[in-house]
Amino acid sequence: MRRLSAAVMTLVLCLAGATGAGAHAFLERADPRVGSTVHTSPAQVRLWFTEQLEPAFSSVRVVNEGGQQVDKGDAQVDPAAPKQLRISLSPLPPGTYKVIWRVLSVDTHVTEGNFTFRVAL
């Protein structure tokens, strides 16, 4: 019985360690929301992740349907909220926009992705 308890405890500890080591910064939510239609041009895009981000190696950009960048190039991780990445936008005319992000979490794992939102004034 003791051997079984020791084996179970070892397995639990190994699994607990593996979960922490495997943590990545996944996109948790966004504003504007993923796939949404907004009726006013947003002033910025904000992205929330599941892990703290490494500011020097995290980026986001926003492009229009023609692939032209429409953000102000001022992407930054919020110092007061290290899981949030944001970027300012110029006023956007109606259309579909793609948000492209690439982040490095403080646990040194890179994740990247993209999504679209639509402006319909």
Question: What do the predicted segments below correspond to?
Answer:
Residues 40, 44-51, 108-121:
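Extended, polar beta-sheet/loop recognition surfaces of beta-rich domains
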Residues 41, 88, 93-102:
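A glycine-anchored, Pro-Gly-centered beta-turn/N-cap motif
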